[in-house]
Amino acid sequence: VKIVVERDPIKTSFEKWAKPGHFSRTLAKGPNTTTWIWNLHADAHDFDSHTNDLEEISRKVFSAHFGQLAIILIWLSGMYFHGARFSNYEAWLSDPTRIKPSAQVVWPIVGQEILNGDVGGGFRGIQITSGFFQIWRASGITSELQLYCTAIGALIFAALMLFAGWFHYHKAAPKLAWFQDVESMLNHHLAGLLGLGSLSWAGHQVHVSLPINQLLDAGVDPKEIPLPHEFISNRDLVAQLYPSFAKGLTPFFALNWSEYSEFLTFRGGLNPVTGGLWLTDTAHHHLAIAILFLIAGHMYRTNWGIGHSLKEILEAHKGPFTGEGHKGIYEILTTSWHAQLALNLAMLGSLTIVVAHHMYSMPPYPYLAIDYGTQLSLFTHHMWIRGFLIVGAAAHAAIFMVRDYDPTIQYNNLLDRVLRHRDAIVSHLNWACIFLGFHSFGLYIHNDTMSALGRPQDMFSDTAIQLQPIFAQWIQNTHASAPSSTAPGAAASTSLTWGGGDLLAVGGKVALLPIPLGTADFLVHHIHAFTIHVTVLILLKGVLFARSSRLIPDKANLGFRFPCDGPGRGGTCQVSAWDHVFLGLFWMYNAISVVIFHFSWKMQSDVWGSISDRGVVTHITGGNFAQSSITINGWLRDFLWAQASQVIQSYGSSLSAYGLFFLGAHFVWAFSLMFLFSGRGYWQELIESIVWAHNKLKVAPAIQPRALSIVQGRAVGVAHY
């Protein structure tokens, strides 16, 4: 591998910035109509449309990534700065069960200071639900000064990233061959980012986080705990907490690794003081991950003729019934960044769902489990992110099909074979959606009807006709019994939610307990299956028919987004790949809503609550999920209305901001319908009347007003929706 760069390829100049639309011949001429500003935004980052040169496109994307990292670091710096300057972090650290986290104080302008509630410890501010305090505690931050230093450090890193983005586009821009060298990239990303990244975090946890958290858990005042660098430079300090530290690296080289089991543990379960995972378990986990990825980062063939070649692996990958197998896929992934991105988004989206579920079932940070608002926010956040990632995967897969797919190279490989039997795939998926839709909804309708007729004995419920999720219960059971059977080394199962164990309470609140699954969960899980399958149907159909269909055989020539196939072809509107993404987004929202409703209600009903001195648990909604959520009426009455009414009645209290957001969000949603339920022609006619009036008064603008195009109107609508 030779690192090939081109020196000074493009001179640095701000002249182009002064010329809006410099990237397109038509846009650079300036505006004739108001459509110009929309096209400017739509195409500014569509590098494919600026040039066909893959090397130039790759350099722009690469450079933009540094800019993205800079923005992320600036944002993070702001979070840490708020923690340093406007928060009650030190107070929270000394009493995390009674004091609520706050890092924002509203200034007294037009009475807004009503939003500053009493969060405890003599601090008035807005309670935050981002989980930052819990992360800071887990990483061993004990003072606001440390947060301040970290914030400054992040800004310095952001500046470095901005410099790197400029440098690698203007001063030393990589050649195309460098972007296409997948083996070298895999080695560096696996060993460097994931391997050394995990190793350095594990090192930080062992040397800084663990001793500090050990002392905090024991009730030592944060101000008396030695500073982080003292633990690193003075081994005796750590050795007082973990005696094996005194032996240094001898046990490591002597292969007596069990000596280190004081701070690299395999306990399972949660720390009873904090309600979070044992940080000694997570340190061990990151060390193990680091080893795996450091090995993985040495598996691919570069300068020395050993290791895997990705092209060889893909081309050897064929079964008896799969034609040419993965032949041609290597060429796709090295010449189409859309294809590459689609795969990565799909996998990252799936991973994000896993993260969402682990945040509550295995709370990774101290005191996260008893901060219910934060738990709910983190779940919601990761679910939304996952939705955008998965829809984005379909969008870029479709763009790949339209712009980058070359049917002459892809013959009888797996991609070609999937495309050739797409009718079978889509019609089967359609059948699955119909089946799931009628059956899942039908179970609810049956229950609503029986409930209305006063026949509870004929309902599907845990107390009448049971539909127990036996497979899910079996999975729960195998995991709950693992410590005594398949995982003899672990002291407890991976999560309290599996069952078997007792509940864990921290500060009089339930941190976690075994989550029972019953008929109500069985019903709502089939709604999940339904909404997810419909989302997949819409998105996959968009990808499989992006280039051609029986209706429009030459769809590839029309591009990724087009409103209709021209005059004289009725019934061809809303058929572009873009429109499938547009429709898929609505079902993604649908799916997420049901997921978040299910999670919110289930946790409040069966998990979250307070515990008395006698050990009696009182759940927030009193365990009403199992009997109430089995009818549509129950969802409307006992969840949506019961919970919304609290928000609606919040005006005039410190919670009023949430009531206003609630109102405002519904307002924005209703506003979206104006774009979605109206025709373009209506607005064009209206605009022309208004322009006529302006002409009469001789105040007509030079730039002609035009209604949004059909696609633009839909984009604005779906964004507000």
Swiss-Prot record:
It catalyses: reduced [plastocyanin] + hnu + oxidized [2Fe-2S]-[ferredoxin] = oxidized [plastocyanin] + reduced [2Fe-2S]-[ferredoxin]. It is found in: Plastid, Chloroplast thylakoid membrane. SUPFAM superfamilies: Photosystem I subunits PsaA/PsaB (SSF81558). [4Fe-4S] cluster binds at residues 564, 573. Signal peptide: none annotated. It comes from the Eukaryota. Coiled coil: none annotated. GO terms for cellular component: chloroplast thylakoid membrane; photosystem I. It holds the Pfam family PsaA_PsaB. It is a multi-pass membrane protein. Phylloquinone binds at residue 683. Keywords: 4Fe-4S, Chlorophyll, Chloroplast, Chromophore, Electron transport, Iron, Iron-sulfur, Magnesium, Membrane, Metal-binding, Oxidoreductase, Photosynthesis, Photosystem I, Plastid, Thylakoid, Transmembrane, Transmembrane helix, Transport. One of its GO terms (biological process) is photosynthesis. Chlorophyll a binds at residues 674, 682. Chlorophyll a' binds at residue 666. The keyword Isomerase does not apply. InterPro entries: PSI_PsaA, PSI_PsaA/B, PSI_PsaA/B_CS, PSI_PsaA/B_sf. One of its GO terms (molecular function) is chlorophyll binding. Its EC number is 1.97.1.12. Belongs to the PsaA/PsaB family. The PsaA/B heterodimer binds the P700 chlorophyll special pair and subsequent electron acceptors. PSI consists of a core antenna complex that captures photons, and an electron transfer chain that converts photonic excitation into a charge separation. The eukaryotic PSI reaction center is composed of at least 11 subunits. NCBIfam families: psaA. This is Photosystem I P700 chlorophyll a apoprotein A1.
